[in-house]
Amino acid sequence: AVAQLAEWGRRVDVPVVTGPEKADPASVVFDGMERAVAEGIDILMIDTAGRLQNKDNLMAELEKIGRIIKRVVPEAPHETFLALDASTGQNALVQAKEFSKITPLTGIVLTKIDGTARGGVVLAIREELNIPVKLIGFGEKIDDIGEFNSENFMKGLLEGLI
C-alpha cells in the first residue's frame, strides 16, 4: 500500500511522507504534520487504510493518530473521510458507526461504484449518522474520482428498478 501511494504521489507530483517498514503510524503522521506546517502545505491527506472496526489495536492506533494531529495543529483535522467500498452492503453502516466513535467523520468516499454494486447503504449512513457522501470513485485512474452528485447517484441507484 505504501509503494502504491508513493507511486500515485510521483504520478501527480505530490510529496508523500512515509516511514520505515513497521514504523508506528502515529509517528509517520507526526512527520507528515510537521512537514506540512514547515512547508506551508494547506492540505495533508493521511491514509489509514486497513483499519477494521473489529480490530481494537488498529482502532486504538487511529485514536492515537487523532491525538497527534491535534497536538501539531489543535484545530485539525478539518475533514475526516471514511472510504467505503460500494459492494460492502449493510456492514458499511456498522463500519461508519464504529469509526464515528473514534473520530468525527465529515464525509464518505464511496469507491468501486463501477461494478454491479450501487452503494445504497450510504442512504442509511446519511439518515442515521448524518454523514454525507463527498466523493465517489468509479475506477482506478486519476480521473475516476469526483465530487458526489446526489441526483446522478439516485438515477444510478434506481436504474432498472422503475
Task: Show the residue positions of the predicted features.
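Helical hairpin unit composed of two closely spaced alpha helices linked by a short loop
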Residues: K97, T106-G107
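A compositional/biophysical signature of low hydrophobicity enriched in polar/charged and small residues
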Residues: F81-L84
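Short, flexible helix-loop junctions that flank or precede catalytic/ligand sites
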Residues: Q90
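Asp-centered catalytic/switch region of ABC-type ATPase nucleotide-binding domains
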Residues: P77, T103-L105
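Non-catalytic positions within long, well-ordered alpha-helices that form the structural scaffold/packing
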Residues: V37, S100-K101
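Phosphate-centric recognition/catalysis
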Residues: T111
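Nucleotide-state-sensitive switch-loop elements of NTP-binding domains
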Residues: A1-E79, T116, G120, I125-I162
